[in-house]
Amino acid sequence: LSVNHDYFETDGHPLAVVGTTYMSSEVQRLFFEHPNVFMWNQDLGQIHDAGLNMIRTGWWTGWDKFCDENGQPYERTLRTLEAYLMTARKYGLPVQFNFFAFLPDVLGGNNAFLDPAAVRRQQTLISAVVSRFHDVPFLAWDLINEPSFSQHLWTMRPNGDPIELAAWNEWLDKRYPDRVKLAAMWNVPPQSLAGTISLPSEMEFSPRGMYVGVNSLRVNDYILFAQESFAQWARTMRATIRVTGSQQLVTVGQDEGGIQDRLSPAFWGSSVDFTTNHSWWQNDYILWDSLAAKQPGEAMLIQETGLQRELNLNEIARRTPENEAALLERKVATSFIQGSGAIEWLWNTNSDMTESNETPIGAVRTDYTEKPEATLLREFARFAPSLQEHLRDPQLPPIAIVTSQASQYSVLADFQLEAQRRAVRALTYLARLPAYLVAENQIQRLGNPRLVILPSPQALSDTAWAAVVKYVDTGGTLLITGPVERDEHWQIRHRAVELGLKAHAEPLVYHNAELKLGERRISLAFGQQQQSWLDSLHFDDGSTLREMPHGKGRIYWAVYPVELAEELQSAAELYSYVATRIDIAPPFSLLAPLPAGVLVFPTVMSDSVLYVMSSDSDEDAAINIRDQATGAALAFRLPAQHAAIAVIGKKERRVVAKYGF
């Protein structure tokens, strides 16, 4: 089991991952306390017969049963894992094994990631387990499932212990050796930073803290401190694995919080061998889930996906089993857009869970009857072998969306996240232009897109701004929507003026505005929250979109944060206008109109073009398109809220593999 820059491989051949999570149908997460190889053999045989090609497993609870207080695993623990791996090997199933869940605090210490004593015991556990199985070729290690940085799970808040406080101050001293300058950045009196600098308080994470004398300008630094500290922990654990002689894959299993305000693959991705995302709740942003988790030059896997049960107020399920399966179909299909595939959570439903949204998750019920999800997974598994032979050398789309972490790691994060999501939908669903995402701290790995879009940034670090301007200088085209006149500490910058534009930022305090695109006028409307917090740009000549040469490239600058206007079509029209100006056309032509809720996303491979189509519409859609690269036509009916995949061979100029039609 290995990875290249984009996909998994087995024995050197691409693998389209269609897997599941499995512990035991009998005792679920207690399978190490109560191992039953007879049940494993039965269940893994069923998974194998379904055609699935990878399983994820590991420890989510009960670590005190697996090892002593120093982290040394018991011999029975290692023998249990050996039996599990032998059973998986019998059925040819690669295994991802998870060590910790949420916070690795089970081995004591004052801070799970920063306390040397705690980290040493974690290394003992990992080292002992990996040493025993370091040469198992079908095994990968997941360091921790859905990590949070502190005891305040699923948020980015300080733990508040002395070790964290000391590490925070050490980090600040290295990053900002001049306390007077740091005070200016944070807009506080210099004397307030004398001595030990406290961790941010809860009020500082509130956008209204400034009204009670507490500003939030330290939040960005705290989040960067947490990101870098966790990335260092991941590097330490990966190095611990490598010392054993293991060359097995290592990852971190993060959920959607990682691409929002928690520990992000944009930071820890370089510490592991592939990145992940767990697509659970962001059902309206399934594509964004994948694009944001994918890091430049590194494979990405949707490592958990499934259906959390949605309930009405009377505790009755909102979705039918068939509708749940349709949503899972869209998630699995979309996982092949710049991703390696998906692992479903969970094969057997876990009736021991205490929350009603989790109890029913799984393809096989406790009475061993199957949900429609199981049939769906079998269908994807049958398709995977015909897909994976084409998963080679994917080309990046010509458009990159650069995300602002300066805004995303502020107390106004929701605006930047919404700008990203709406930019993705406007480009791909409405303008029919595929794109990829690059986070601000990854800007040096941008590549060579023909167009970079900076959607409603409001703020950006000086380093990132210099990088995008350099991209333009070397011949690229940049589209900015709204101002970018602040840095990560919300300090004023005069970036438009520095580019030779007579312009300034001002508060966006109106509901209606117009954006002029040549002879066309696009109406924009901004809601209450946008009027309360956002800025717009004002050009002295009254124009609303400027086009200007810079170096060898060009900059298009719209004065409004268009992605955050109420009507999404406005952003799509702006994107199409700029793309047309620089001769970027959709990679397929529409032979018949498509509903706005239908995604058609092509990826050019070395020998083919991979088309993923997903419907968010309430009506069936007649897909009738022609691929521009091959001239091949694609025509079929896509059922409402379902997905389909087609592979068009470049030599054959026709569909050579398909799913869903």
Label each region the model flagged.
Residues 135-266, 271, 289:
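Polysaccharide-binding and catalytic clefts of secreted carbohydrate-active enzymes
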Residues 333-413, 421-434, 499, 503-528, ...:
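Aromatic- and carboxylate-lined catalytic core of secreted/periplasmic carbohydrate-active enzymes
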Residues 1-54, 68-71, 378, 389-390:
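N-terminal carbohydrate-binding accessory modules
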Residues 255-264, 425-445:
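A short, well-structured beta->alpha microelement
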